[in-house]
Structures are given as C-alpha cells and as structure tokens.
Amino acid sequence: MSCEASGKIWLNGEMVEWEEATVHVLSHVVHYGSSVFEGIRCYRNSKGSAIFRLREHVKRLFDSAKIYRMDIPYTQEQICDAIVETVRENGLEECYIRPVVFRGYGEMGVHPVNCPVDVAVAAWEWGAYLGAEALEVGVDAGVSTWRRMAPNTMPNMAKAGGNYLNSQLAKMEAVRHGYDEAIMLDYHGYISEGSGENIFLVSEGEIYTPPVSSSLLRGITRDSVIKIARTEGVTVHEEPITREMLYIADEAFFTGTAAEITPIRSVDGIEIGAGRRGPVTKLLQDEFFRIIRAETEDSFGWLTYI
C-alpha cells in the first residue's frame, strides 16, 4: 500500500509540512532500527470520524518504548491529543495513522542512551491492506522458512521497527513463491503469526489462536476479535497450534489493524475448509464492522470521535 502525502505531520510537538518531516542520515534509527511504532485506523461512520482503540494503541506504544529503554518526552494523553490533532489538521475522514518513536541524531553504537528520543505522528488515506476483495474471497498463505524470533533474542511484545526485518524476509519469500501472505512458526515449530498479522483458525465452531508465548505481537485487533467472539457465545482457545491443524481447519483468518479480519482460503496450496470465507469468520467481520460503522452500540468503548 502506497503512502500518499496528506499535508502535515506532527513532529516533536509541532505541525510541519509533510516534506519537511525528515531525519538526519546519521540518526541512530537509520543504522540500528531503533524505533517503536503503532498502526491505527480512523473510520468514517454515521456519527462522524472515529479512531479505533486509540488509547490501547498508545499504551502499547509506551510499553514498546519502555521495553527498549526509550523515554517518550510526552504523556500518553498528549500523544492521544497529537494523533487527533494530526487527523484533523489533514482533513481526513478515514485514514491510517502512524505514531513512531525513534532514537535520533546523537551517538552511534549499541549503547544509545544519550541519543535524543524523537516522536512523530503521520496520517494518510488507506485502503484494504491485502486487497479490496480479500475481506470476502480470502488470501493464499504459505508457511515461511523464516521463523519468529525467540523471546530471549528479540522482545516480540514490542512493536519495534527492527523486528520487522524478520517480517520482511517472510513476506518477500511468500510473494516470490506466489502467495499473498506468509505464516511464521515460533522457535518451537508451532504457528506464531503472519508477517504483520495475528492468525486464527476455526474447528467445529470453536476458535483457536496461538498464545502470546508463541513469539507474537499482542495484537489489538486480535484482542477485539476474541472479545467479540466471546460476546457472541463462540468459544476461543489460546493454545499452541501445529502446522497441520491449519490444513484441516474449517476456517482460518488473519487479524490486524491494516488487515482487519481477512479470511485465509489456502495454506501451502491446501484449501482451507470450503476455500472461501466461512460462517464464523463472516460473523466476526460483521460484528467488527457494525461497531466501526456505528450500526450497533459501542459497548466496549472502542471508538474515539474526532
């Protein structure tokens, strides 16, 4: 998905022109991947424009920064305000929002405590991450030869820029082999997640998803789906999942801020269930989008109107 210029970016407390939101080539982040970030969606509905789970995203941003010893020079509330301000300033009704915290220009090396911590918020128009038709017809995925990092090598609970080099390898491999997306295993050989999404399967009407201990990011859309499913009376199991369990599942789907709830129609060329979006996946999609579109009560308090 391309990143189209939308006007202004919030950078270290000030609104600057899109083209002026730059960093020095010797900034620490450029050389060592020392950034943490979030991906957040703003949706247009009958009541206005609403940011989905804003505070949960900002809390995770601060948690990621804490893991990497990065002291954000703003409060969570100030970052929430900056995100709302950025969307308003750019006149966007529906968009993708990217707050990012990074170590800037200061010192080189792997002990970066004296580097400044910079913060930026950008927002731009955004479509369906895995394709406009993917939400209905699904995507083809392949299990990657690249594994998710063990938790004692890289902290997967941090949404850190450097972690996504691992994801890039898996995604490029998947596309090269003719798949839309990759599925990655954890260091024990169990299913972990996609290159940028969490994963679920459905078997005999019940939902299964890997536990957080399977080297995955604790996804906010993942949490939303679990809450919706349980509210709808669907049993959800968080437990290790083997590769072959995907092959014999009735349904499977990815979740993520960008991917939303995207069905998986095949894995490694093996058709999942009927090879199309299944009834449980559709139920979850319908309830998810009903909340976003203000077609039902926001009983979870997930929408922040701007």
UniProtKB/Swiss-Prot annotation:
Transmembrane segments: none annotated. The modification N6-(pyridoxal phosphate)lysine is found at residue 159. Its EC number is 2.6.1.42. It catalyses: L-leucine + 2-oxoglutarate = 4-methyl-2-oxopentanoate + L-glutamate; L-isoleucine + 2-oxoglutarate = (S)-3-methyl-2-oxopentanoate + L-glutamate; L-valine + 2-oxoglutarate = 3-methyl-2-oxobutanoate + L-glutamate. Signal peptide: none annotated. It is an enzyme of class 2 (transferase). Gene3D superfamilies: 3.30.470.10, D-amino Acid Aminotransferase, subunit A, domain 2. GO terms for biological process: isoleucine biosynthetic process; L-leucine biosynthetic process; L-valine biosynthetic process. Pathway: Amino-acid biosynthesis; L-isoleucine biosynthesis; L-isoleucine from 2-oxobutanoate: step 4/4; Amino-acid biosynthesis; L-leucine biosynthesis; L-leucine from 3-methyl-2-oxobutanoate: step 4/4; Amino-acid biosynthesis; L-valine biosynthesis; L-valine from pyruvate: step 4/4. Its cofactor is pyridoxal 5'-phosphate. InterPro entries: Aminotrans_IV (IPR001544), Aminotrans_IV_CS (IPR018300), Aminotransferase-like (IPR036038), B_amino_transI (IPR005785), BCAT-like_C (IPR043132), BCAT-like_N (IPR043131), BCAT_family (IPR033939), Class-IV_PLP-Dep_Aminotrnsfr (IPR050571). The keyword Acetylation does not apply. It comes from the Archaea. The keyword Amino-acid biosynthesis applies. Coiled coil: none annotated. GO terms for molecular function: L-isoleucine-2-oxoglutarate transaminase activity; L-leucine-2-oxoglutarate transaminase activity; L-valine-2-oxoglutarate transaminase activity. Pfam families: Aminotran_4. Keywords: Amino-acid biosynthesis, Aminotransferase, Branched-chain amino acid biosynthesis, Pyridoxal phosphate, Transferase. GO terms for cellular component: cytosol. Belongs to the class-IV pyridoxal-phosphate-dependent aminotransferase family. Acts on leucine, isoleucine and valine. This is Putative branched-chain-amino-acid aminotransferase. The gene is ilvE.
